[in-house]
Amino acid sequence: MISTQHPNPDRLMRWATYASVATAMLLILTKIIAWFLTDSVSIMATLIDSSLDMLASIVNLVAVSHALQPADSEHRFGHGKAEALAGMGQSMFIAGSAGILLLQAVERMINPKEAMAGIDVGLGVMIFSMLATMLLVGFQSYVIKHTDSTAIKADRLHYKTDLWVNGSVIIALILTFYNFSYFDPIVALGISIFILVSAWEIIRESIDLLMDHELPDEERKKIKKVILKTPRTQGCHDLRTRRSGNMIFIQFHLELDATLSLLEAHSIADGVEQELKSLFSNVEVIIHEDPVTL
C-alpha cells in the first residue's frame, strides 16, 4: 500500500502506540471486573487476549521509538527493521495465548457450568470494549494511511480481531444466560482460532520485511510507470525494491540516450527521483544511468 503524505508521520506513529497501550490497559481493568462477576470462559479469553495485546503494544511502542531513530554510522539504512522484530515478538505472545485459550475452552466443555451471575455487567463491559476498540482501530487506520507502518498494522490486526471476538462473547453471554452452557467454550475455541490466524499474518509480514521481500507487483508497476512517463527516459531494468519500517528503498538502472551529456543524464535521473519521492512518503532512491544507442 502506498501511504499518503503527512507533515509529521513519525508523531502519528508514536501517538498510535500510546493510544494502543492506553486502550489495552483500560480494557484489561474492565474485563477483570467482568470475569470476576461472571466466571465466563469467553470473557476470560478476551481478558487474556487484551493482556497480551497490551504486552504486544508495549513492544510496539519500544520498537517504533527505536525504528524512528535516524540512520547513524553503524546503521546506514536506519533502524526500520526493529518493527519487523517487534512483529515476531508479538506473534509469539499471540500464539501462546491461543494455546491457553484452547486448554481452558476444552476444560470448560468437559466440565460445563450453570448460567452465570452478573450477566448484565458482563454485557455492559463487552459493549464498552467494542466501542473503545472501534475508536482505536479508526485512529490506527488513519495512521496506517499516512505511514504504512508494519508495526501499527500488526497492532490494528489484533484489535480488528477483537471486534469480532467481543461481538461473539456478547452472544455467548446471552445464550449462556438461557442455559446454552456449551456455547461459551465454543466461542472461546473460535477466539483461539482467530488469534492463531492473526499470529500467522504477523509472522508472514515480519519475515517478508526481515528477508527484504520485494514490494507488491502493483507498487512495482506504479514505480515503472513513473519512470517511463518521465521525458527523455528510454526504459529501465534491474528494478529492486524493499521496505524497512516505514522506509522504502528503490534502485534500478535507468536507460538514457547515449549521446546525452553527463549533466543532462543526471538532470533526468533527478527528475525521476523527485517523481518517485512524490509517490511515496518515505523513500530512498538509487539510480544507475545506462547509455543506450537509439
Mark where each language-model region is.
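Alpha-helical transmembrane cores and adjacent cytosolic helix/loop segments
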Residues: 1-220
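Peripheral (non-transmembrane) domains and long loops of multi-pass membrane proteins
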Residues: 1-17, 74, 79-82, 198-294
